[in-house]
Amino acid sequence: MSKPVITRFAPSPTGYLHIGGARTALFNWLYAKHCGGKMLLRIEDTDRERSTEAATAAILDGLTWLGLDWDGEAISQFERAPRHREVAEELVANGKAYYCYASPEELEEMREKARAEGRPPRYDGRWRDRDPSEAPAGVKPVIRIKAPRDGETVVHDAVQGDVRFPNKDLDDFIILRSDGTPTYMHAVVVDDHDMGVTHIIRGDDHLTNAARQTIIYNAMGWDVPQMSHIPLIHGADGAKLSKRHGALGVDAYRAIGYLPAALRNYLVRLGWSHGDDEIMSTEQMIEWFDVKDINKGAARFDFQKLEAINGLYMRSSDDQALFDALVAVLPEIEGGKELAEALDDKGRAQLLLAMPGLKERAKTLVELADGAKFIFASRPLALDEKAASLLNDEGRAVLKPVYPVLEAMGEWTAESLDAAIRAHAEAEGLKLGKIAQPLRAALTGRATSPGVFDVLVVLGREESLARIGDQIG
């Protein structure tokens, strides 16, 4: 019987959860779910100078917001240092690794010699077969792996295929430093083995690491997990995605106003596809996702595509769910605090009532919040430039006879208001737009908004008439 699939996401808490890391986590999560397995979380916090608790919290928060739940407790790599030392010493005891007492001066001499001879700098193995009794007094050694010197190390990769590394290019690298701390290369192997990880899905910038890690697995006689090294995300210009392209942390995408489901949908299509399907539910992603279908070529991040997908998700969202998502993000967006303060019982009811019209025009929650500001604006309304031009003398003259029509309304519904204004326009020999444009400007202070009859209903009779009255004098 085959082992259950166990994947892992292993971020370093030296900053936010960046978008590439989020995609890696998503691929690990989807593959584990697809196979009925587990995704574990390990925080690679061995770099004590750069690792912070705030970054760890931001990573956990980002994963939770994206809906990527992990199995069990998050594991700290730093706390496992005694186990890393134990395995390093075991490798020495078994003749698979050795103590190296080379001084910094000797190592620099090796590098200089290699440079002079046009070779890449490599440790020359001078302590590989020497007796530790020859060790200089008072020098704390490092532990180096005894890497094979002939042949090649092959990484069997589900995405890249078999990748071969000549062993002459892989020197006896350090697995334990002289202060007893493990190197990243060593700690990762020990942790993945002890956690029972069967499948490693990570960026292809780790491919060279995979060769060295395979040497450690083989030295310990452990099974090597199935590797899948996925292409990095590039910007629209084809260069590796960076801050220059607007590469942000997941927390920033949240504050910009993207929905987690939309971001998941966009990220899964960066380097993986299922036919021509663009929009897919989480259940479909889980059913269809397989590492063998990941592309070898780098995917390009397209903000406009993400925005379009987010808009689709917003339009198809339940009004209450979208309302809740907007309220949750208000503290993080510009002007959101003022909007949140306006959401008393009446304000909440108005915003929910406006949601069908607002979500048709917005691609992000920030745009949704901006579109909703007219509901809570103080009188007299500040007019934007286009609204002011619509409320010139001609616009006000068109609007003046509309006021008594609205004032006389018995039923204040979108349908009855639509019928009354259309009848008035016909009687005046005007097109509906000739009335609707200055009316919208008077009600919202803007030239664009949800449907003008929906706006009248959301604002209510009293507020609508008061705003129109402010403009016609």
UniProtKB/Swiss-Prot annotation:
HAMAP family: Glu_tRNA_synth_type1. It is an enzyme of class 6 (ligase). It is found in: Cytoplasm. Its main location: cytoplasm. Residues 113-133 have a biased composition (Basic and acidic residues). The keyword Ligase applies. Monomer. One of its GO terms (molecular function) is glutamate-tRNA ligase activity. It comes from the Bacteria. One of its GO terms (cellular component) is cytosol. It catalyses: tRNA(Glu) + L-glutamate + ATP = L-glutamyl-tRNA(Glu) + AMP + diphosphate. Its EC number is 6.1.1.17. Belongs to the class-I aminoacyl-tRNA synthetase family. Glutamate--tRNA ligase type 1 subfamily. Pfam families: Anticodon_2 (PF19269), tRNA-synt_1c (PF00749). The lineage of its organism: Bacteria, Pseudomonadati, Pseudomonadota, Alphaproteobacteria, Hyphomicrobiales. Catalyzes the attachment of glutamate to tRNA(Glu) in a two-step reaction: glutamate is first activated by ATP to form Glu-AMP and then transferred to the acceptor end of tRNA(Glu). ATP binds at residue 243. This is Glutamate--tRNA ligase 1. Residues 113-136 are annotated as: Disordered. Keywords: Aminoacyl-tRNA synthetase, ATP-binding, Cytoplasm, Ligase, Nucleotide-binding, Protein biosynthesis. Coiled coil: none annotated. GO terms for biological process: glutamyl-tRNA aminoacylation. It comes from Brucella melitensis biotype 1 (strain ATCC 23456 / CCUG 17765 / NCTC 10094 / 16M).
